[in-house]
């Protein structure tokens, strides 16, 4: 027995008479006194539980997690990517590898989701709600556990009376206090009296607590050795606090589970509760108030969903309101929308945590709350029905060691029904979790588990062998196979051979399946000959400095940032400055770029270890790469790559033997280098030794991973011709442009022209349709104004659509590429559905935003001081301030060592002259002295970058980056132009666009967008004012191959709807693996396989038109190509491109859709009055020259115009356009027949895509 028990026994022996009198008084008390005694009895039981058994007390870490989640869900504090990263870094700090802690976080989120689903007005924290939901107890009892004592004044008096032996004074103060003392001294007698006199409702809760007290001794034996009183203000745990946060949280969570299981023995097994139970167990209404009734209703309604009803009146277009009734409580439409948004964010967050972090499925708290969630049966019409079931399935089956779960991930990732474009349009908030499956599989593969990697590829190949596999899913699965070959660290040769045999079956399929299978077969054959070659080729292309010869560089260059980024390919982000969501995506890439960029030495170390794992099956424990100097690592890496490249083209058996022999000899050299470095360190003084050890530990080998790409962000100022006159009109097309945006593109392209080799230029447009149209205008203006800027450049455009804005060009790409739909569009949108809430426009002030960040930072600092051991804290405090001083004090010795190493290496190279040796030594010493300061700063930052918490924003950025790496197909879209004249003929300019032009009700309503956004009810009133246009139309009709046939005039007609759609050609670019061969060999391969699109277009034009004096040179080239297709290559200069050009089977064409309207009623006549034409050009002019009209071009409003012309934009007809600008009446049918549709490759805009879905 403890000291507290002894003191209580003494007080019991001294006050027997008082106890008997008080017991008699208890029997004669009225109902009010009985209620008071009952509450005091419960308080005394809690007090004895705390004093006698040292019961569970909630640790600060668990409380902090609850507070962080509560703030992030309800207060909507997130306003930037940095704040988002701070939240996740704080939440998962030192808890990433703790499965029980992740399970607890998921349990808290599920609790909040159930509260919102049942429309409960919870005024307490998530931890309180979870406790009351699991135990059917009151919140006050939770506060007793939280505080370690009673919460009212009577409990404080009881504690004082138990600690003091002066019972006479306590009897004189108050009779109620004396009765409470008697209850504390005689628990058994008082409990019997209370059972006879008090109500059953109050006794039910008291009996549950007494049962827990009876079993508390068993809990003490399990947790007393590991549990400590751990608060933010305690200072008594200096020697015993030397445990990691995972240990602390483990003890915390185990104690929480034990307290729940012991406190609520009957409530854990929810299956034992009958669904037809008339009255659930009640709790004390005096302690919980009205909130307890809500919990009672929840427990009674969890088994059935009959009380959750959705009542709608009318249709969505009507003005009637929608009522949502849950448990008899009606909600407004705004409250419904807010609740749905929060529930969606909670489910998405749970899905992210369960897929990217290992949790304990057997965690008692999680098992109970999942069981309660499974009892809720949602209707299929509910907002989150599909996501609810999907998250529940993940939580019930998540076990990454189980093959069934890996099969589930591959099945869900390749499921194209969930990522259907129609579903994405109808409900933009569903199925956002599907974009997380592929990163989750990639994370499993990077764990370097041979069994898991083998299981993933076996399941993937099993899908590809299925005879009933749809064609759409085949392309997605092939792309998954290609993607996993890039990221997997180790892959057995047997798996590669089985993949070769399966992919060969798709080689004979038509395009694009056969082309894609050929590319994958090339990758697999290279992997079989030289394991890891695909990864090393991509790494060398993105990081050219990693392949530099060690003879041409010094040790100081390896730590130089300029040398690291030398010749790295750059992704140029064209960001819409006036789009807040575009700026958010820019911040997403900028915030995660510097954090996850390793050094050259680190990449080389990772590569060396991975090659030894693939070939010899040994890791760094048998190598010791961390003991090598950076220059030695570079030398070893260069030798190993030389061996791998030389043995690639030998026979399989011979290459394996030579490769193993050479790698063993290089391993012996590594050991020698390690011995030399250790001997040299032993000869140095103590300060120098500590400095060298800190340098050695910087490049410990890690799992292979491609670093972030190199980015450049260029602000583009979007322009509205309708509201603001442009800075300049580009001649001869009079394209409206912005001078600053155009100047930025000129500077960027000029830098590429200064280089001596051909390049790919990758532009990533971040924005919506307005951004695309603005950049397209500047791009075309430069192509016609300064064509020398595009010489020998392969221009590619990537579309990164903003989260909530409409982007029609992104929808078009999604219709061709399911990977783009799933892993780019949905992945970006998922950022808005993960807590903390991420509104496009923050409603918080900067002061509130900063206070939130500071509060979370303080919590993280507290957990940091709690989590780390005292020894580790002292080491960090000593090393961090001393490390720069040690390096600065030993600059001279470090430089001398570098000079000696370089001289030894340079003497072995007989081909180098003495002058070059001296120059190298001087350059290395000067570089070392100038970069010593920068080196010390990077070492202090790399300590924080060793194991950063992977946030959702970093996962999204990484997933989008693979679009820039692996897109081997290309969607080539011909550019359209709309020439418009106002009422005054001098008001002329040209608007380029890509997809669609329309004149209908959408065009009319677009002019009142501001009014509709402020008051949506004005749509019906505005529709009554719509008046169809009466126009004259002239079209150039063509056949299905795009060959012009004849001109057709349609005079004086009124059309309700006019649409012009750009029809995509039914062929795409041929995919091929990026090779390291010279440009000449790649161009010759192009000639042997395919011809260019320009040549075929020219031939068709010559066969049909027969005239065209302006294109004689092109005709001659085309005739030569007909005779010798294998010898000539007169296409565009895209030699360095990895996207080979294929034969375009048909010329570009447009589809015209006309819907005639009654002139008097202004309505559509019938469905029979819809006319469709395949055309090459169209002219429209208003009959009344005083009336003007507007037009929508790719969703952007332009006008007003009196006359327009729409045709394809070709460089061969610039003179005609220039003449048309001067005189609008000079254009006729003969002018359009000259060189019409004679497009070159540079007249197409190339959009690289991952997989191509053929047009039906």
Swiss-Prot record:
<feature type="compositionally biased region" description="Polar residues">
    <location>
        <begin position="1069"/>
        <end position="1079"/>
    </location>
</feature>
<feature type="region of interest" description="Disordered">
    <location>
        <begin position="1"/>
        <end position="53"/>
    </location>
</feature>
<feature type="compositionally biased region" description="Low complexity">
    <location>
        <begin position="147"/>
        <end position="214"/>
    </location>
</feature>
<dbReference type="GO" id="GO:0005944">
    <property type="term" value="C:phosphatidylinositol 3-kinase complex, class IB"/>
</dbReference>
<protein>
    <recommendedName>
        <fullName>Putative protein DDB_G0292252</fullName>
    </recommendedName>
</protein>
<dbReference type="GO" id="GO:0005942">
    <property type="term" value="C:phosphatidylinositol 3-kinase complex"/>
</dbReference>
<dbReference type="InterPro" id="IPR019522">
    <property type="entry name" value="PIK3R5/6"/>
</dbReference>
<feature type="region of interest" description="Disordered">
    <location>
        <begin position="898"/>
        <end position="951"/>
    </location>
</feature>
<feature type="compositionally biased region" description="Low complexity">
    <location>
        <begin position="925"/>
        <end position="942"/>
    </location>
</feature>
<feature type="region of interest" description="Disordered">
    <location>
        <begin position="1069"/>
        <end position="1136"/>
    </location>
</feature>
<dbReference type="GO" id="GO:0007186">
    <property type="term" value="P:G protein-coupled receptor signaling pathway"/>
</dbReference>
<feature type="compositionally biased region" description="Low complexity">
    <location>
        <begin position="1080"/>
        <end position="1136"/>
    </location>
</feature>
<dbReference type="GO" id="GO:0046935">
    <property type="term" value="F:1-phosphatidylinositol-3-kinase regulator activity"/>
</dbReference>
<feature type="compositionally biased region" description="Low complexity">
    <location>
        <begin position="898"/>
        <end position="916"/>
    </location>
</feature>
<feature type="compositionally biased region" description="Polar residues">
    <location>
        <begin position="222"/>
        <end position="243"/>
    </location>
</feature>
<feature type="region of interest" description="Disordered">
    <location>
        <begin position="145"/>
        <end position="243"/>
    </location>
</feature>
């Amino acid at each position: 027995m403890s000291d507290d028990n002894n003191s209580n026994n003494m007080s019991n022996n001294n006050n027997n008479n008082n106890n008997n009198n008080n017991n008699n008084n208890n029997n004669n008390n009225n109902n009010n006194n009985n209620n008071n005694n009952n509450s005091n009895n419960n308080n005394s039981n809690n007090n004895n539980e705390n004093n006698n058994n040292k019961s569970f007390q909630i640790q600060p870490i668990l409380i902090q997690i609850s507070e962080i989640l509560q703030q992030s869900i309800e207060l909507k504090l997130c306003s930037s990517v940095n704040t988002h990263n701070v939240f996740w870094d704080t939440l998962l700090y030192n808890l990433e590898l703790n499965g029980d802690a992740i399970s607890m976080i998921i349990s808290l989120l599920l609790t909040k989701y159930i509260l919102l689903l049942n429309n409960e007005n919870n005024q307490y924290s998530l931890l309180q709600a979870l406790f009351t939901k699991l135990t059917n107890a009151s919140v006050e009892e939770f506060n007793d556990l939280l505080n370690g004592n009673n919460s009212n004044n009577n409990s404080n008096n009881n504690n004082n009376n138990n600690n003091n032996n002066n019972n006479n004074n306590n009897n004189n103060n108050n009779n109620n206090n004396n009765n409470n003392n008697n209850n504390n001294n005689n628990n058994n007698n008082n409990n019997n009296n209370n059972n006879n006199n008090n109500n059953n409702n109050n006794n039910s809760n008291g009996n549950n607590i007494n049962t827990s007290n009876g079993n508390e001794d068993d809990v003490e034996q399990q947790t007393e050795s590991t549990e400590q009183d751990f608060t933010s203000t305690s200072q008594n745990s200096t020697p015993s606090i030397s445990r990691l946060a995972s240990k602390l949280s483990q003890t915390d969570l185990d104690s929480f589970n034990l307290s729940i299981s012991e406190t609520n023995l009957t409530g854990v097994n929810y299956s034992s509760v009958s669904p037809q139970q008339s009255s659930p167990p009640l709790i004390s209404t005096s302690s919980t108030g009205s909130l307890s009734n809500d919990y009672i209703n929840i427990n009674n309604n969890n088994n059935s969903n009959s009380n959750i009803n959705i009542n709608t009146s009318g249709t969505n277009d009507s003005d009637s309101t929608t009522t949502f009734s849950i448990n008899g409580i009606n909600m407004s439409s705004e409250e419904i929308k807010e609740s749905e948004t929060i529930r969606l964010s909670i489910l998405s967050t749970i899905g992210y945590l369960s897929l990217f972090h290992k949790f304990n499925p057997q965690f008692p708290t999680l098992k109970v709350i999942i069981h309660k969630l499974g009892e809720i049966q949602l209707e299929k019409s509910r907002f989150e029905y599909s996501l609810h079931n999907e998250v529940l399935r993940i939580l019930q089956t998540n076990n990454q060691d189980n093959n069934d779960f890996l099969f589930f991930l591959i099945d869900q990732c390749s499921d194209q029904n969930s990522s259907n474009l129609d579903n994405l349009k109808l409900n933009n908030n569903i199925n956002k979790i599907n974009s997380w499956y592929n990163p989750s599989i990639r994370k499993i593969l990077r764990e370097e588990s041979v069994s898991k990697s083998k299981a993933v590829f076996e399941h993937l190949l099993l899908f590809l062998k299925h005879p009933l596999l749809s064609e759409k899913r085949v392309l997605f699965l092939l792309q998954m196979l290609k993607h996993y070959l890039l990221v997997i660290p180790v892959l057995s040769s047997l798996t590669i051979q089985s993949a070769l045999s399966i992919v060969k079956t798709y080689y004979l399929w038509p395009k694009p399946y056969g082309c894609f299978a050929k590319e994958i077969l090339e990758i697999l054959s290279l992997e079989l000959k030289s394991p890891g070659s695909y990864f090393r080729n991509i790494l060398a292309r993105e990081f050219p400095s990693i392949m530099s010869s060690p003879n041409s560089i010094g040790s100081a260059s390896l730590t130089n940032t300029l040398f690291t980024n030398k010749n790295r390919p750059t992704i140029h982000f064209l960001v819409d400055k006036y789009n807040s969501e575009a700026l958010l995506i820019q911040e997403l890439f900028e915030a995660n770029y510097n954090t996850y960029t390793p050094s050259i030495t680190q990449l080389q170390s990772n590569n060396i270890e991975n090659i030894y794992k693939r070939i010899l099956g040994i890791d760094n424990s048998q190598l010791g790469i961390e003991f090598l100097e950076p220059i030695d690592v570079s030398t070893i890496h260069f030798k190993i790559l030389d061996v791998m490249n030389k043995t690639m083209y030998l026979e399989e058996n011979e290459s394996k033997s030579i490769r193993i022999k050479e790698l063993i000899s290089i391993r012996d050299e590594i050991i020698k280098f390690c011995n030399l470095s250790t001997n040299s360190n032993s000869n140095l003084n103590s300060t120098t030794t500590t400095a060298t050890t800190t340098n050695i530990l910087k490049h410990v080998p890690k799992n292979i991973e491609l670093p972030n790409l190199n980015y450049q962000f260029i602000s583009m100022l979007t322009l509205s011709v309708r509201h603001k006159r442009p800075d300049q009109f580009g001649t001869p097309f009079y394209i409206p442009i912005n001078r600053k945006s155009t100047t930025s593109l000129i500077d960027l392209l000029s830098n590429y022209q200064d280089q001596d080799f051909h390049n790919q230029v990758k532009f990533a447009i971040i924005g919506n349709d307005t951004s695309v149209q603005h950049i397209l205008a500047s791009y075309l203006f430069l192509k016609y104004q300064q064509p020398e800027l595009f010489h020998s450049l392969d221009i590619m455009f990537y579309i990164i659509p903003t989260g909530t804005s409409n982007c029609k060009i992104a929808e078009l790409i999604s219709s061709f590429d399911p990977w783009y739909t799933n892993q780019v569009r949905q992945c970006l949108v998922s950022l808005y559905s993960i807590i903390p809430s991420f509104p496009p426009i923050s409603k918080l002030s900067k002061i509130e935003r900063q206070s939130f960040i500071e509060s979370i930072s303080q919590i993280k600092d507290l957990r940091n001081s709690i989590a780390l051991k005292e020894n580790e804290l002292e080491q960090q405090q000593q090393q961090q301030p001393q490390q720069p001083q040690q390096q600065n004090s030993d600059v001279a010795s470090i430089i001398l060592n570098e000079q000696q190493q370089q001289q030894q290496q340079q003497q072995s190279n007989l081909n180098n002259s003495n002058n070059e040796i001296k120059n190298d030594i001087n350059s290395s010493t000067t570089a070392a002295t100038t970069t010593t300061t920068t080196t010390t700063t990077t070492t202090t930052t790399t300590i924080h970058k060793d194991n950063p918490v992977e946030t959702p924003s970093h996962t999204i950025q990484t997933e989008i980056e693979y679009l820039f790496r692996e897109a081997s197909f290309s969607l080539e879209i011909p550019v359209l132009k709309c020439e418009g004249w106002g009422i005054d003929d001098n008001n002329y300019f040209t608007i380029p666009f890509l997809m669609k032009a329309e004149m209908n009700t959408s065009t009319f309503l677009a002019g009142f967008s501001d009014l509709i956004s402020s008051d949506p009810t004005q749509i019906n009133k505005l529709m009554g004012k719509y008046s169809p246009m009466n126009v004259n139309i002239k079209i150039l009709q063509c056949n299905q191959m795009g060959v012009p046939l004849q001109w057709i005039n349609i005079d004086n007609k009124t059309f309700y709807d006019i649409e012009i759609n750009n029809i995509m050609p039914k062929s795409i670019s041929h995919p091929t693996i990026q090779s390291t061969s010279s440009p000449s060999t790649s161009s010759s391969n192009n000639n042997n396989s395919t011809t260019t699109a320009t040549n075929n277009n020219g031939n068709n034009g010559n066969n049909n038109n027969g005239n065209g004096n302006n294109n004689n040179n092109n005709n001659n080239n085309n005739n030569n190509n007909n005779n010798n297709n294998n010898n000539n290559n007169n296409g565009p200069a895209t030699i360095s491109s990895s996207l080979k050009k294929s034969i375009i089977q048909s010329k570009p064409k447009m589809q015209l859709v006309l819907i005639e309207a009654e002139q008097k009623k202004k309505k559509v006549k019938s469905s029979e009055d819809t006319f469709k034409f395949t055309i090459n050009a169209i002219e429209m002019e208003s009959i009344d020259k005083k009336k003007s009209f507007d037009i929508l071009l790719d969703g952007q409003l332009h006008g007003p115009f009196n006359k327009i012309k729409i045709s394809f934009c070709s460089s061969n007809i610039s003179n005609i356009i220039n003449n048309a600008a001067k005189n609008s009446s000079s254009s006729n049918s003969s002018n359009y027949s000259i060189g019409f549709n004679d497009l070159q490759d540079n007249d197409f805009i190339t959009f690289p895509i991952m997989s191509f879905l053929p047009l039906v």
